[in-house]
Amino acid sequence: WGRRLVEEGYVALCVDMFGNATQAESLEHGLRLFGEVTQDRELWQRRARRVFDAFRARPETQGCEIAAIGFCFGGSSALHLACTGAQLAGAVCLHGDIPRISGEEAKAISASLLVCNGAADPVVPNEQALTLAQDLKGSGVDWQMLLLGETGHSFTNPDAARAGSR
């Protein structure tokens, strides 16, 4: 996706949040990797913010609006980054775990938020979407959510379900 964004004329940064170019070999392996990183919310947010600040300091990003876009763990990371007060134009979470957002965090969000999840996702319960709606109610945050019917996890990657079943 990063190459595709660059081809469209954007400056892009792809972040390896697991480290060492690790890719999940199955859904179970992916969930284990996800759990290892996400156990400490403050650490997760600090890491995301550190990457953002380094990216923002690059000459090619000066004067540009920046959005954080991610799939699954990356989507969750985009929402966590928005909660740090990073000056983002937008944060997009595609089939990602949806974090709780406190009132203090909501006050720090400058980004417009877009969350897109599958209604039949076995990994991200629909209750998370409802909870996010409650967390952001009356907060002043510009947010939209799409819950796609009869759609499972990793809907942006049709091969993911096949890879996870091997």
Please give the residue ranges for each predicted region.
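Serine-hydrolase catalytic machinery in alpha/beta-hydrolase-like enzymes
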Residues: 1-61, 156-165
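Short alpha-helix in the alpha/beta-hydrolase fold that links the catalytic acid
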Residues: 125-135
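Primarily recognizes the serine-hydrolase "nucleophile elbow" in alpha/beta-hydrolase
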Residues: 48-110
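C-terminal catalytic histidine-bearing segment of alpha/beta-hydrolase fold enzymes
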Residues: 137-166
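Acidic beta-to-alpha connecting loop that harbors the catalytic carboxylate
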Residues: 119-122, 150-152
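Short beta-strand/loop motif that positions the catalytic acidic residue
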Residues: 109, 115-117, 121
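Alpha/beta-hydrolase-fold catalytic nucleophile elbow
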Residues: 16, 69-71, 92-95, 116, ...
